[in-house]
A protein has these predicted regions:
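Macrodomain-like recognition of ADP-ribose-binding/processing modules
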Residues: 1-239
Length: 239
């Protein structure tokens, strides 16, 4: 099978499983974990419930099989405020190596686990990742170097909506619960050639302030996910 390192957006992967990195206190407030929380809210609820029961410990892997792709939550921190530890990262990698066949996983996408908010040097993470994952049988492995400019399916959907110009900010408000005045800002940001991804949009600054806050980011992800599935709140009737 194959082992590939690439730059891009891990959420574009076609792999049957994808790895998220988490703490053990039920918080997904930043980094790749926040992206997972926004894209898979039901997974987050299940993870949080297990954390609140004190069942998840550093070095363990929490699978979530109700989504496509399957999500493997690698617990590489105890508390979100604290750094990760190399031994916890190694423990999760070893557990994965010992169990991927049993789980039936034949393809998977990894981030550089622990390199962004884990506080572990990237070269250390690369060494460990290659040590455990680069020569496995019966599985295709992708390891993603995060590219903040790489678009994803959700951003492409948003861009298509903006470029089609078929829905007014007021209609989009009715469909998403994001106020029309924020939709105006979102639309303007998407039209900016410097905006290439959801990540860019979430950090888009106007007059020293981000145009979209936490609540509206959650609503935007929810709207775009439902829009792609053809499931969303219909615009209010004219009658």
């Amino acid at each position: 099978m194959s082992y590939i390192e690439k730059k891009g957006n891990i959420f574009n992967s076609k792999a049957m499983a994808i790895v998220n990195t988490v703490n053990c206190v039920g918080a997904m407030g930043k980094g790749i974990a926040l992206d997972f929380k926004l894209r898979y809210p039901e997974m987050f609820k299940e993870y949080q419930k297990i954390c609140f029961q004190h069942l998840l410990k550093p070095g363990q892997i929490l699978p979530y099989k109700k989504s496509t792709p399957i999500i493997l939550n690698f617990a590489i921190k105890d508390d979100w405020k604290d750094p990760s530890k190399v031994e916890w990262i190694e423990e999760t990698l070893q557990k994965f190596v010992n169990n991927y066949n049993r789980l039936g996983i034949t393809s998977i996408a990894f981030p550089w686990i622990g390199a962004m908010n884990g506080g572990i040097p990237l070269e250390t993470i690369k060494y460990l990742t290659r040590k455990y994952l680069s020569d496995l049988d019966g599985i295709d492995i992708e390891v993603y170097d995060f590219d903040p400019d790489a678009p994803c399916v959700l951003y492409n959907t948003l861009k298509d909506i903006v470029e089609a110009n078929a829905l007014s900010p007021s209609e989009l408000e009715d469909m998403s619960d994001i106020k029309a005045r924020y939709w105006v800002k979102i639309i303007d940001a998407v039209k900016d050639s410097n905006t290439k991804s959801i990540n860019n949009l979430c950090h888009y600054i106007v007059d020293g302030k981000r145009i979209i806050g936490k609540t509206n980011i959650e609503r935007l992800f929810d709207f775009l996910t439902k829009y792609n599935k053809g499931i969303y709140i219909e615009p209010k009737s004219l009658f």
